[in-house]
């Protein structure tokens, strides 16, 4: 999959990190994007989450500013989500951008997909 679908305030967005986006994100975060999880016992800050969202919007939503991204994140929260609900989205963004490996599926799921 080249992107993930994301919806806020009934508007659809495509999220993906390219190498260019990852480099810009590293500069904004001041660290490797994986470092935001620390040793696995911390959650990213809202600032980090919005930075990831902003970087991942750049490929398919040309012209989205950081200020626009703040509004998109607010709209997503207003849709009934919580800040911690965004963590799986971050992981999906990282998977499509090649930062982490895709989830491994079991053999029966792969076989079922091939049938369809």
Task: Show where each model-derived region lies.
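Short linear motifs in exposed loops
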Residues: 16-17
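A short secondary-structure junction motif
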Residues: 55-59
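An amphipathic alpha-helix signature
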Residues: 46, 50-54
